[in-house]
Curated annotation (Swiss-Prot):
Record site: Activates thiol group during catalysis: 180
Alphabetical list of InterPro entries matching this protein: GlycerAld/Erythrose_P_DH, GlycerAld_3-P_DH_AS, GlycerAld_3-P_DH_cat, GlycerAld_3-P_DH_NAD(P)-bd, Glyceraldehyde-3-P_DH_1, NAD(P)-bd_dom_sf
Annotated binding of D-glyceraldehyde 3-phosphate, by residue: 152-154, 183, 198, 211-212, 234
Entry keyword NAD: yes
Induction: In the absence of pentalenolactone (PL).
PROSITE patterns named among the record's database cross-references: GAPDH
Native source organism of the sequence: Streptomyces arenae
EC annotation from Swiss-Prot or TrEMBL: 1.2.1.12
Lineage of origin: Bacteria, Bacillati, Actinomycetota, Actinomycetes, Kitasatosporales
Binding site for NAD(+): 12-13, 35, 79, 315
A cellular-component GO term for this protein: cytoplasm
Name under which the protein is recorded: Glyceraldehyde-3-phosphate dehydrogenase 2
Length: 334
């Protein structure tokens, strides 16, 4: 059965999701997009991307639609998600990627409009279930979970990074720093922002700011709830981020044992979600990598009970591929 998808919000993540679905999945069909932008602009930004390059098929704007190759995708422009005709369009799953409707009560409006499930492409509040694939997706219950959060890109990287290490040697406590690409929540030039650090020009500064990944990890790995803390450093790159996790372990270990644990995970149960590399990478090397976490073996350190591990991630493309994987998982039980 082909699962019919609607995308609410056609910004960076919405367009990346569209590209990922087109590149990977014959099981999913994007049938409609809702965004307040004008159709010619939306079509142009899908066709030409500063990071991903040109779309591999011809993209043209039509009245109320975008034509991609031989497919026509309906375009809606509705502010109220409850007014969207998902049922009339036969949409099974809505990917909520506006960044606005992250509260489950608001996201549930998509269900009122006829969708069967909603995936929030962000950390959420009041959701039925928060999932990180490879970590807790086995707990998904289609009978109980309708509004599902895919957590954040950082939580997807940290979740895999932490679970492999916790399963191998046990994590007692730890600190995480994500060195993260700038996002649209920041300013191109100095301008007012509720976070005074984010008020500063994104392309000119290293910007310390908060990260909810450590708190969110408790939702997907309850045994680590309250054991990790975190913050972020936003840096002047458009995509390509890295998680630096330093923990106190419950037993002694070695660099070799830690690396072996990640190598086994990457070639086994985490294949496709976790990649293992020995090469000396920089951030542009992982742009376009679909993995949740690219483990950088050469940066592994052990000092007494402390272990440092580092995982790269394309915060747009990797995360969007997880959204496609999650939609496929949910769709398999509709």
């Amino acid at each position: 059965m082909t699962v019919r998808i609607g995308i609410n919000g056609f910004g960076r993540i919405g367009r990346n999701v569209f590209r990922a679905a087109a590149a990977r999945s014959s099981e999913l069909e994007i049938v409609a997009v809702n965004d307040l932008g004008d159709v010619p602009t939306m079509a142009h930004l899908l066709a030409y991307d500063s990071i991903l390059g040109r779309f591999p098929e011809e993209v043209t704007a039509e009245p109320g639609a975008i034509r991609v190759g031989d497919r026509t995708i309906k375009v809606l422009a509705e502010r109220d998600p409850g007014a969207l005709p998902w049922g009339d369009l036969g949409v099974d799953i809505v990917i909520e990627s506006t960044g606005i409707f992250t509260d489950a009560a608001k996201a549930r409006s998509h269900v009122d409009g006829g969708a069967k499930k909603v995936i929030i492409a962000a950390p959420a509040s009041g959701e039925d279930f928060t999932v990180v694939l490879g970590v807790n997706d086995g707990d998904y219950d289609p009978e109980r979970h309708t509004i599902i959060s895919n957590a954040s890109c950082t939580t997807n990287c940290l979740g895999v990074l932490a679970k492999v290490l916790h399963d191998a040697v046990g994590i007692d406590s730890g600190m995480m720093t994500t060195v993260h690409a700038y996002t649209q929540d920041q300013n191109l030039q100095d301008a007012p922002h509720k976070d005074l650090r984010r008020a500063r020009a994104a392309a000119l500064n290293i910007v310390p700011t908060s990260s909810g990944a450590a708190k969110a990890i408790g939702l997907v790995l309850p045994e680590l709830a309250g054991r990790l803390d975190a913050f972020a450093l936003r840096v002047p790159v458009p995509t390509g981020s890295v998680t630096d996790l330093t923990v106190t372990t419950r037993r002694g270990t070695s660099v070799e044992e830690v690396k072996e644990a990640y190598a086994a995970a990457a070639s086994g149960p985490y294949k496709g979600l976790l990649s293992y590399v020995d090469a000396p990478l920089v951030s542009t090397d992982i742009v376009g990598d679909p993995a949740s976490c690219v483990f950088d073996a050469g940066l592994t350190r052990v000092s007494g009970p402390q272990v440092k591990v580092v995982g790269w991630y394309d915060n747009e493309w990797g995360y969007s591929n997880r959204l496609i994987d999650l939609a496929t998982l949910i769709g398999s039980s509709l």
